[in-house]
């Protein structure tokens, strides 16, 4: 038993092996430490490079903002949806809506307001229009077609399922606005839809902007949202995705001077056009158009930030003012800063609304550009 408990003496080579093992272990520890230090240094270098790149991008963006290439003012147009009821067939109703969309896009209209001039806002909307609100059928159809045409082609399938109102939308001429881009077209801004794709926490969502690659943005957003993306100037050609950040839909207009389409708003009556303005202080310049107005050539437009031009239907603005329960005015002219006749000496007894939009915006455009640019 004593012999079994006694330590066996080391052989002549075992002590040396033990020393070699310790040296090898110490050497491995030092190598591992060096490797960790090297890895940490590389990580810090990458972080520093990313910070420098972010700082450089911020400086470039700040310099771009200082250039002030944008358009500071907005232009809104309001018209009654009842003009569609004057068309003789579903095809002509659709084509009429397309003419209005084209006219507004040509003159860079930022907002189209479709109002109900016939006082039908109190009626219940039934059938396929349930849930839209208290609006007339023509108003809703006009608004839907206007929205459809404004949407870039590569996003329409996601936002516009098959609908009876859009049955003949294939007949319409495209707007071909700056935000309706081809796949390989280069641009600082693009419209896109947030795709339903899993992302790691703290990393941004992916957006389909109609290009060969998706765009990775700086925020996590709900799938299905339509967003305006500003693409980074430096894009690595070998990356699986492009990179950019989500910006306001107004940025292309205010920072780059690009026309970026229009928004569509439904108003239950003429007074709601003014009362439900999307701007904090409302419209600071309102213009009514009528054959009973003063000559547009003598009109002096004041400085403005948000202009609104209102058109009447077959019976003129008087019909909308009379049918509105919120208005108690003898003449619609008192509702506007300017009440103008944009086509004096007309050779036809009537000017259709789609014609009046083209005529009026062409007549007002020079004054609007000057007065809008003067606003500080």
Swiss-Prot record:
InterPro entries to which the protein is assigned, alphabetical: Alpha/beta_knot_MTases, NA-bd_OB-fold, Put_MeTrfase-C9orf114-like, tRNA_m1G_MTases_N
SUPFAM superfamilies hit by this protein: alpha/beta knot (SSF75217), Nucleic acid-binding proteins (SSF50249)
Catalytic activity: uridine in 28S rRNA + S-adenosyl-L-methionine = N(3)-methyluridine in 28S rRNA + S-adenosyl-L-homocysteine + H(+)
Binding site for S-adenosyl-L-methionine: 292, 312, 341-342
Biased segments, Basic and acidic residues type: 15-33
Keywords: Cell cycle, Cell division, Centromere, Chromosome, Cytoplasm, Cytoskeleton, Kinetochore, Methyltransferase, Mitosis, RNA-binding, rRNA processing, S-adenosyl-L-methionine, Transferase
Pfam name, any one: Methyltrn_RNA_3
Region Disordered, annotated ranges: 1-33, 49-71
Disulfide bond annotation, renumbered to this chain: none
GO cellular-component term (any): cytoplasm
Broad enzyme group: transferase
GO biological process: cell division; maintenance of centrosome location; miRNA processing; post-transcriptional regulation of gene expression; rRNA base methylation
Example of a GO MF term: S-adenosyl-L-methionine binding
Top-level division of the source organism's lineage: Eukaryota
PANTHER family: CLASS IV SAM-BINDING METHYLTRANSFERASE-RELATED, METHYLTRANSFERASE C9ORF114-RELATED
Miscellaneous note of the record: Depletion with RNAi causes a significant accumulation of cells in later prometaphase with misaligned chromosomes.
Assembly: Interacts with INCA1.
Function (record text): S-adenosyl-L-methionine-dependent methyltransferase that specifically methylates the N3 position of a uridine in 28S rRNA. Required for association of the centrosomes with the poles of the bipolar mitotic spindle during metaphase. Also involved in chromosome alignment. May promote centrosome maturation probably by recruiting A-kinase anchor protein AKAP9 to centrosomes in early mitosis. Binds specifically to miRNA MIR145 hairpin, regulates MIR145 expression at a postranscriptional level.
Name listed for the protein in its UniProt record: 28S rRNA (uridine-N(3))-methyltransferase
Species per Swiss-Prot/TrEMBL record: Homo sapiens
Gene: SPOUT1
